[in-house]
Amino acid sequence: MGTAQVLPGILQKHCCILPDRNTESQCTLCGEPEEEEAGDLVQPGISFPGPAEEDLDPQYSWSPTQHFNEERYSPAPRSMKGLSGSRTQPPLCSGHTCGLAPPEDCEHLHHGPDARPPYLLSPADSCPGGRHRCSPRSSVHSECVMMPVVLGDHVSSSTFPRMHYSSHYDTRDDCAVAHAGAKINRIPANLLDQFEKQLPLHRDGFHTLQYQRTSAAAEQRSESPGRIRHLVHSVQKLFTKSHSLEGSSKSNANGTKADGRADDHHHAHHAKHSKRSKSKERKPEGKPRPGMSSWWSSDDNLDSDSTYRTPSVLNRHHLGPVAHCYPDALQSPFGDLSLKTSKSNNDVKCSACEGLALTPDAKYLKRSSWSTLTVSQAKEAYRKSSLNLDKPLLHQDAKPALRPCHYLQVPQDEWGGYPTGGKDEEIPCRRMRSGSYIKAMGDEESGESDSSPKTSPKSAILPEPLLKSIGQRPLGEHQTQTYLQAASDVPVGHSLDPAANYNSPKFRSRNQSYMRAVSTLSQASCVSQVSEAEINGQFESVCESVFSEVESQAMDALDLPGCFRTRSHSYLRAIQAGYSQDDECIPMMTPSDITSTIRSTAAVSYTNYKKTPPPVPPRTTSKPLISVTAQSSTESTQDAYQDSRAQRMSPWPQDSRGLYNSTDSLDSNKAMNLALETAAAQRHLPESQSSSVRTSDKAILVSKAEELLKSRCSSIGIQDSEFPEHQPYPRSDVETATDSDTESRGLREYHSVGVQVEDEKRHGRFKRSNSVTAAVQADLELEGFPGHITTEDKGLQFGSSFQRHSEPSTPTQYSAVRTVRTQGLFSYREDYRTQVDTSTLPPPDPWLEPAIDTVETGRMSPCRRDGSWFLKLLHAETKRMEGWCKEMEREAEENDLSEEILGKIRSAVGSAQLLMSQKFQQFYWLCQQNMDPSAMPRPTSQDLAGYWDMLQLSIEDVSMKFDELQRLRLNDWKMMESPERKEERKVPPPIPKKPPKGKFPITREKSLDLPDRQRQEARRRLMAAKRAASFRQNSASERADSIEIYIPEAQTRL
């Protein structure tokens, strides 16, 4: 009890941080009242010798340590990890939340092997010893968290409500049962209120975090979804309010959580890492927090019992049986998950306790509670409860590998769908809330990447068995895949089958396009670590407050998301405001050794961001996407379409690889995207398709496209853009050619994010979607003109029309034109792709023919007023005018006409010829451009209609002249003029007689004076009427056009 003397002061700070906690009973160490009787912090059923009981601050010693027999579980974890479990740092009594060297009675806690069986705190001891460094921060939850480690030792009857454990090593059940007893009953009201009020609920907050999935977990679960949801909303608000504070709070809360988790040696190891990472996370240190990777897993947030379980869930996979094996994995989760609010329990739970309970059980702890606490609340709670948050930082230092896991410690309440390892475990309200997202993650990547990203940094640290047992990698991949799937809905689904319990379909339906865009960007960035530094910096700056400790690895994992954020600061702000949690969740899976996970992580984090962004206007979404994927967006879309075409039209699959035309066209974007894709391809050499998409020969791309068509691993870009729930897999197939596997697809997603988002938002206007439309048009054109396009890679990709129109000899030119057109100054082509009988049109230019073919291909808009239709009108009008001119010229030759009449004839013919040679020609080219999907300034049908209306004025003017000539001819070429005109003409005749040339114009002017006035009046009326009609048409269609035009422009601009 030598430490008992020192402990009081610290315990006063830590154990007694929250009056509520200390009101229950006195902390033996600090003398503050403890919640023992209520069981909030006291671990029910944990009996310690008088000293132990005293030493252990029931409030702060989340009886997980008490429950856990260190002998049973602690030894292996310690020896295995040797971080927090093995090294008995100042032997903090698990019972002592003080985090100080525990009293003598706490020895059992300190030494798992030495732990007395009566003290189920033994496992926690190792954790307290190793973990309690963070404990000082919030020793209550930290130590308590540690307790659940030894589920076997845990006493289900222990007073510590959270410490109720089934005799078996139930991952969540341990903590859930332990805290379920009294804590759940008591803490929920107190802690929930406190957290909701942002009151420092250190112990309660930890209690909430300690919320388990056992009987208590079930109870909490039932109430946690609504309660946690409410808490999550509150936390999100707090999170938004205190992004900057979140960094510190996260660090503190995470560190504390790590402490709490240290109870379990496995957890203790992770707790240590998490402590460091957590404290860093909670603190705006900009350091990646290993716990973050654990924290960031949606599982953490999804688990209503313990958000901290994300890593712990991962660890828990194998931790129950291999509790010692995944201390590493748990450390990060613990540190990250230190402070969480249980859905059912308003109090903050000890993430460590939850993690401890969690670890034994393969099930994933519910993570909604922590997300409720999340950064802002946990931050405050940790500030008050974790005086020694710096200690976790030390642990975090020891857990550098876990820092990547710390990338995103944002509560994943919205992400709830990260059942880290517990696919079997349903994600309570979190999953329900973000079920679609979770399902997106869970369906394809849940099993693979749920935990993988979390322990990605740890994966190096953790033994492969640990990773496997914990299933962290698969979880990380699942998460990554989930995000990718959310981004590229289709591929993710099959990829995340292991985590099918994540019902991501709705989430995917919400965010899948946006997530795809994000994933595409994130993956592109993650894939090309080239942009990692850049994205890291961006991401840091944007999310530093939120991801203070995510710096090193969160940045790596979220490098592309950083770019994405850079792309869309407004979106970033929105994410930080409401989706920081998502971001924080993302990083934990980012560092996973799985490149796909990293990409997915980035993509996921944006996917989560997308959850809100999807509402963001396509322009906003497109801009951010385009910033990174401006070119890739186009090219992804184009690629996807061309892949689709290539797949459908094997003749030019390689050409479909001309996808990278847009890359060529967009140098900066191309450089970035190429780097990203190249990096992705390099990372996924097996998926050389990715690099081949950009860099590899088209043959590879074609083969990959074919493979992807088979595998449905579509490039997210196009898939997402056009995919928006409508053609998820068709696009997917198209892009599938681009990306052979999900990771490649992730790259694709990044590339075509802009288009994806844009198309998703306006998929209804998909035909008018510029980027997507251009790409689709190219695809259709290519299909329509396989013969034409197969010869030119880029041209083929975007269709012969692109080649024809831009006539770039180089793929880059095509790509540039195509990209610009695709992103679309004009969406005309689709609108104007009316099935036109080319025979009726004037001979179209070579490039025009493919456009016609495209129209025939079926890409023409339902509206027949497209370029072909106007060309028909123009052709008919030209023939009519030419007939008039020929007729009048013949009349002038055959008849001896007066100069005045000849002047009229010349005027009419000249006007007609001028009209035909200039305006008609201009309109003709406009129509051709409209039909040319590759036309950079592709006019819309509304543009053509407006121009045609203008032409009608000139045509009417010329027609009036010819009508007058016709009347003169019918009058035997005798001037038939009204008296006024005759009078006027009498005056002018001398002028006409003077110089024929001068006379001609003068005569024309005078002769046209009255008619001109009349014509001008009629013209004005006609113009007004036509303008009104055209305005209505244009306003109706141009709203979409302008949106499409501007959205693509937004994409092109950024």
Swiss-Prot record:
GO terms for biological process: modulation of chemical synaptic transmission; neuron-neuron synaptic transmission. Expressed in brain and kidney. Transmembrane segments: none annotated. It is found in: Cell membrane; Postsynaptic density; Synapse. Residues 32-87, 242-301, 442-464, 609-666, 719-746, 977-1021 are annotated as: Disordered. Keywords: Cell membrane, Membrane, Phosphoprotein, Synapse. It comes from the Eukaryota. Residues 242-255, 628-641 have a biased composition (Polar residues). One of its GO terms (molecular function) is molecular adaptor activity. May play a role in the molecular organization of synapses and neuronal cell signaling. Could be an adapter protein linking ion channel to the subsynaptic cytoskeleton. May induce enrichment of PSD-95/SAP90 at the plasma membrane. Interacts with DLG1 and DLG4/PSD-95. Belongs to the SAPAP family. This is Disks large-associated protein 2.
